[in-house]
Amino acid sequence: EIHPFNAVTVDTVRSFDPKGIIFSGGPASVTEATTPRAPVELFKMNLPIFGICYGEQTMVAQLGGEVTLSDHREFGRAHVDVIGDCVIFEGVWKTGERHQVWMSHGDRIDQLPDGFRAIASTESAPYAAIANDDKQFYAVQFHPEVVHTPDGAKIISNFTHTVCGCGGDWTM
């Protein structure tokens, strides 16, 4: 199910008993006080969460990390260096490899929240992908949902199937 950020409450989420949550991207800057935020209670529901672009930034900011407005906006094709193994990369990417992705962001993550580690980086985005394996929180600065990230669908599938345990009886 898809729900807009401003119409979601924890009770709404509980009512459909999800196996995981995906925070999507968006054009806003997390550095502005009036931009979208996830309900804080979602982070306490013991559900896997996957953040995409703005979804990564808001996750980091809300969990105690640091996000700033970047001097270098990334837009278009980029190459990420895989710097850590992770369940969302299983069967897709390995540590030491470089892969094409699609970036579109103006914010920069400068410090991760406690418990997180970097799993991929670019020259200007040291936290292009992050993981907190204990909480099953994962996030990427790039856009796995677009065709310009060739392995993106596999990364999303690893989150939905492997991490969340969803069956394959639904479509994207």
Model-identified regions with their sequence ranges:
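Flexible gly/pro-rich beta->alpha loop and the following alpha-helix that scaffold active-site loops
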Residues: 1-52, 57, 63, 154-172
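Pocket-forming structural segment of enzyme catalytic cores
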Residues: 23, 33-52, 57-153
